[in-house]
Amino acid sequence: MIFSTLEHILTHISFSVVSIVITIHFLTLFLLVDEVVGLYDSSEKGMIVTFFCITGLLVTRWIYSGHFPLSDLYESLIFLSWGFSLIHMVSYLKFKKRKNNLSAITAPRAIFTQGFATSGLLTKMHQSAILAPALQSQWLMMHVSMMVLGYAALLCGSLLSVALLVITFRKAIKIIGENNNFSFSFGKIQYMNERSNVLLNTYFLSSKNYYRYQLTQQLDRWSYRIISLGFIFLTIGILSGAVWANEAWGSYWNWDPKETWAFITWTVFAIYFHTRTNTNLEGVNSALVASMGFLIIWICYFGVNLLGIGLHSYGSFTLN
């Protein structure tokens, strides 16, 4: 009873704090008042509080349930939110007193995942239950934690690539919207990519353009680093899952929906790294691949659970 109450309290504290953090962050982003009242620093400290609250929540549920809290969709969403908070913590320690643009990605992701986890759709999963026989293995912690951390890092890196594309093609998108012409061929993308590369040489003429160039370079650099980390986690998760599957079901790979989409996700980001090796394809083109990867990850992590079929059906839920 005590652990259940503590878990409930920590859940609401972390959700409330991260909500305040997002509000503060957008105030500092659009009103530019962080230099006056120090709101930006307050939002960073708020994410630290959120990180420790979610950590306490996971530890409490671990003690209360007697197993590592990654047995269903609810627990994995909480762990995913913890992963976003962890990435934010690492970037905060990296930047220290400099402004950290990554918080614009991690904070909304944390509140989105935790908000969905605590919603009425997953009420039946809020109470910890006896671990399913298929999950009673030491591989649970290794496999699922690596996969979820990989999802968290890849989602953050992909959103940074989306932000890069928005900044790069903002004027082109505005023109297309005004003309009500929504056809957007790869030829146009290639043209705009070449045009943007030419414009990079003239950015020094305007301080605003120079700042935009610096921002896109920073987004591209951080996107590559975070996606690299997520790709490593994803690879370890897939390999450990294959070993676990062989022990549990006698086969390393069964091509059920979850495994198939995990392989598709891995392939998409392998293509992303291939584009990074070619100087003519890196930048905008690699960001396009990463942006597609963002959708693929959500299908792999969440969309497949809606099917409720396959060897991973124990983590699924149905919309009533």
Curated annotation (Swiss-Prot):
> For this UniProt entry, what's an example GO CC term?
plasma membrane
GO molecular function (one): heme binding
Where in the cell does this protein reside? Plastid, Chloroplast thylakoid membrane
Q: What are the recorded Gene Ontology BP terms?
A: cytochrome complex assembly
A Pfam family the protein falls into:
Cytochrom_C_asm
This protein's superkingdom? Eukaryota
Q: Where are the transmembrane segments?
A: 13-33, 46-66, 73-93, 147-167, 226-246, 259-274, 289-309
Alphabetically sorted, this entry's keywords are: Chloroplast, Cytochrome c-type biogenesis, Membrane, Plastid, Thylakoid, Transmembrane, Transmembrane helix
Q: How does it sit in the membrane?
A: Multi-pass membrane protein
Fetch the InterPro entries from UniProt. Answer: Cyt_c_assembly, Cyt_c_biogenesis_CcsA, Cyt_c_biogenesis_CcsA/CcmC
What NCBIfam families does its record include? cytochr_II_ccsB (TIGR03144)
Quaternary structure, from the entry: May interact with Ccs1.
What PANTHER family does UniProt report for this protein, alphabetically?
CYTOCHROME B_B6 PROTEIN-RELATED, HEME EXPORTER PROTEIN C
Q: What does this protein do?
A: Required during biogenesis of c-type cytochromes (cytochrome c6 and cytochrome f) at the step of heme attachment.
Which family does the record claim for this protein?
A: Belongs to the CcmF/CycK/Ccl1/NrfE/CcsA family.
Return the protein name.
Cytochrome c biogenesis protein CcsA
